[in-house]
UniProtKB/Swiss-Prot annotation:
GO MF entry, a single one: RNA binding
Similarity remark: Belongs to the PPR family. PCMP-E subfamily.
Keyword Kinase listed: no
GO biological process, one term: RNA modification
InterPro entries (alphabetical): E_motif, Pentatricopeptide_rpt, PPR_At4g14850-like_plant, TPR-like_helical_dom_sf
Top-level taxon of the source organism: Eukaryota
Protein name: Pentatricopeptide repeat-containing protein At3g51320
Region described as Type E motif: 424-499
Keywords from the named record: Repeat
Coiled coil: none
PROSITE patterns tied to this protein: PPR
Pfam family, one: E_motif
Amino acid sequence: MAKASSIRQFVTSRFIVPGTGLLKGFKLVEDSNSITHLFQVHARLITSGNFWDSSWAIRLLKSSSRFGDSSYTVSIYRSIGKLYCANPVFKAYLVSSSPKQALGFYFDILRFGFVPDSYTFVSLISCIEKTCCVDSGKMCHGQAIKHGCDQVLPVQNSLMHMYTCCGALDLAKKLFVEIPKRDIVSWNSIIAGMVRNGDVLAAHKLFDEMPDKNIISWNIMISAYLGANNPGVSISLFREMVRAGFQGNESTLVLLLNACGRSARLKEGRSVHASLIRTFLNSSVVIDTALIDMYGKCKEVGLARRIFDSLSIRNKVTWNVMILAHCLHGRPEGGLELFEAMINGMLRPDEVTFVGVLCGCARAGLVSQGQSYYSLMVDEFQIKPNFGHQWCMANLYSSAGFPEEAEEALKNLPDEDVTPESTKWANLLSSSRFTGNPTLGESIAKSLIETDPLNYKYYHLLMNIYSVTGRWEDVNRVREMVKERKIGRIPGCGLVDLKEIVHGLRLGCKEAEKVFTETSLEKCYSDSPS
């Protein structure tokens, strides 16, 4: 309020006193937290005649680059008419919805004599990184070489990160090797790039070779194994990190809680919670949501609900993880009641919400209610069904004694989900789950284990195939095999576990990973409280 009041006083003043008044104006512009305030200040500068003082204009230009309105920033830049102050424009493109326009702007001003520096290329490369266009990246790299900026470490780090984001890991590795004096950002960038491109073991090897590590380095590796479905290693890395003298930050704790939940390690999860109570006076929606998610996955739904009910701030992900906890691990009716409260509170559900709701209906045997929710999802909320929703409906019909409808639901996939992989798994699951014939499923699962013996999902799939036909000795045998190979603890067999595994096997489907494997917890980082 005080800041807005100062803006109003500045805007309505009849004149601006040079010296102290000018500095106060600079401060108001730089501290403005709203582009509307910036427009007001801009207008006042023009009407008072002070905008044409280049120092005012440049300060305004720098402030405008924070708001993501690149066209507004470009208009200020063009009105100044000075080529050398173009760098804020690249920053504006970076936070805007049109980063790909940055390269065109660069070549436009280059024709008029603009001389780029290392700051130019760091921002420009970051813009190209967001577009994932490796050809544009190479073009920018060539420009950095031409203007003598390619040996500047921040530029080299930016190029390396850009190449990994564009899938050109070999180019990134080549750059890394050629950097004579690497800093910790260089190491973190290449390790994160290896993880991003699926080479977790090589990333871990390089991580072990790092001369110095920071908390970001540890978070990268903890997250890497969590993303590779090996939460046990993530927890081991955290312990190693603590022994090395690092305390972790909010991101570390969210990753750790996620790992505890996904591996059903309630004891470790409680320990993290106790540590949070001892060390963090002010909680956050991210941490609170991670705690709810962890307790829910460890089947302590009552504890999860107590935390949920105590929160003053919740976002969509908070609601989703609580609904999922009830519907998958607790009393399904509690999740359905929470869903009704969610939509009555005018919070729009998403595809993850309906995964929980439909699974809850399957567990409770509520066929007509499940059909109604499915129709609500499609007709009212315009959410297109994916593999996950079809699988939930298949289990709903199967548990109610309608195997034909179950098979039909699973095979009736959306066009974009129909791939050789999804069709194969649909047929496999139909035969294994609904008709009680595990022979085909057993054969495929074993062949998958042979091709990737460290992927716990394949063992988990085999255990579920055995469990649906009551082959409990075989289930225990696979469990022992998992322990001997130290692949990591596997949660108990059940409807959700099988569903999660199958959905994750729909290769290349980012939507699938978001719906089941991660239960969308990672969205907490970007979702705002509601």
